[in-house]
Amino acid sequence: MKSWIREKKYECGEYRTVGIYAVTDQEHRQRGRKHKESSRGQKARNKNASMRRYQRKVLANFDKDGFYVTGTYEDAYRPESFEDCVQDVRNYERRVKAAVIRRFGEQRARRLKLSLHAVRNGEKGKLHMHGFAECKGLTTAERREFRAMLEELWRRRVPGTGEYEPLGTCNADRIDVKKILGIDGDGKNGTVGYIYGHSERRCVETRNLTLPEELRAADVEFMHPFLPLYHDKRLTERLAEAAAGVQ
């Protein structure tokens, strides 16, 4: 069976990411109907691929002028179900959009980008929110206002009144791109890996997010027994790992 290594590159805003993985001619055959559940290893690979796609999407849409948002609940306002938490995140997205339009105008609100997740670990895990937010074109002072806005709008209306009360604590921290890339020394998968570490998660996004640009793939054929044609030591190790099925 013929095997080779495929190198795929993606333009993600100011960054370019590279994916290296093994490919066989068997993968190009016509796919039949699925008859059994994927193995645990395949599920892990699928999850890792999904995480990498989302990481590229974050890099393509958010930079150091954006914010990483975390919203938690006071016990009195904790949702009864995961779907209720998802609805709170949708309401939060809607309130942020409306507030940005009122404060900065509709034209700049079109540059508002949000990618938020309702998450929890297991049925008994605590429900909360993580995500990314950025409004392009704001001055330094306006970004401070936007940050305060993000933290204040994690709230709900008091029934029967025009007043609001906070759902819990909301923190909006400046985005650290090293954490997104997983090169800050705190876990190899970074912030996105932390979000994907939750067993349940649902994403709520604005519609104006751009997708990374996929560049033309480059294939490198391997000779038996998987000796790469590249000679760089580190790249050789990575290619050999990919050929062995290591992600």
Q: Residue spans of the language-model regions?
A:
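Right-hand nucleic-acid polymerase module
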Residues: 1-127, 135-247
